[in-house]
Amino acid sequence: SPHTVELDAGVPARGLHGEGYRGHVFWDEVFVLPVIALRTPEISRALIDYRWRRLDAARAAATAAGLAGALFPWQSGSDGREETPEALYNPRSGRWMPDNSYRQRHVGLAIAYNAWQHYQATGDLEWLAERGGELIIEVTRLFASLAEHDSATDRFHIAGVMGPDEFHDGAADSPGSGLRDNTY
């Protein structure tokens, strides 16, 4: 809505039609912002600026985790802090399980992608220099600090992360928690 431009609002999971995620903001804007940027760039900018206004909280989260850059939360509350609950109900198994979805670090990549897509759609270099570029750089710094070099393969890997399937937080029979390189 055009009214969003005046608000400090993000794109909540499931839009406005479900209570399952309590209005938290995830990465769902990655699916809609590229189109919004082409049709109503002022709304796209406002929604990405929502993330920019929470950049200091994301930097603090990265620092607390011993990382550089900006660590955006998987479930962001209104102030930008991580709001992922400790337990998750699995409707397939009918059991509660630990909710490790806070390991879904790709939310930052979605934010950086949306910032770049907004710039490409609008050509707004001033916005990119003042806000969008800062988001892109800080997310890049985070992933550079997450990556570890494997000298045996001469490749970089990211361990302990989780893909977008919140019910599968690790590969079967693998040591440790999370996934390697966001793959199953």
Residue ranges of model-derived segments:
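Secondary-structure capping and boundary motifs in well-ordered enzyme cores
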Residues: H17-D28, N100-A110, L128-L135, D154, ...
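Acidic/histidine-rich catalytic neighborhood
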Residues: L142-Y184
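Short, glycine/acidic-rich hinge or "gate" loops at secondary-structure transitions
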Residues: E6-P12, T63-A65, W127-R131, E148-A159
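Structured mid-domain segments that build the active-site/substrate or prosthetic-cofactor binding neighborhood
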Residues: A110, Q117, I136-L146
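Conserved positions within tetratricopeptide repeat
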Residues: R45-I48, A129, I137
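Substrate-binding groove/exosite segments of carbohydrate-active enzymes
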Residues: S1-G123
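Inter-helical turn/loop segments and adjacent helix faces that build the functional surface
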Residues: A115-G133, A147
